[in-house]
């Protein structure tokens, strides 16, 4: 039986203070690199090592924030930013393509102290969607902004826009071409688009990255980052 590699990652990467049972101020962080179904058999040992190294970097980055007394929101943002900067995950620089060959990114974050949240959707020129989602939460009267409106808000906040091709990667592009071939073949057999999309193998159905953290003050925060897939 084939084991989904990212399912292993999602369940195994968890960092907890060694002093959690003794200290008065325990803290913790958990991350996942995607809830997709990329089969482990598709990775060489070297590739799997690279994935695990980046996941370790992400969780350790968030852990360091908490260990130094930082807030859970900062830990979540820091951990997810690491994953967004990597081409290995379906977020930020590793985002899969839309059907027309571009990239549209989404992210959201929530503060457990007051249940405030911020989100962005369908942004094309934002290098770190999770950071923009946090700006929406902190500096906007809205909970969610999308598309051009989100990017106009980003410029108002001093966020530099980037070219959409920053998110291009060869493996994702090859996956797009294969997926489009399968969709076209399915539609040629009289299947409408949604039915054809559902017929895609699990290897084309990828998930988000995310993190949840508890800081020394007992505050919980969570965030996630992903993209619009094959729209």
Name each region found by the language model:
Residues 1-5:
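Positively charged n-region of N-terminal signal peptides that target proteins for export
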Residues 7-17:
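Bacterial N-terminal signal peptides
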Residues 18-22:
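Sec/Tat signal peptide C-region and signal peptidase I cleavage site
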Residues 23-230:
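Alpha/propeptide regions of enzymes that mature by internal proteolysis
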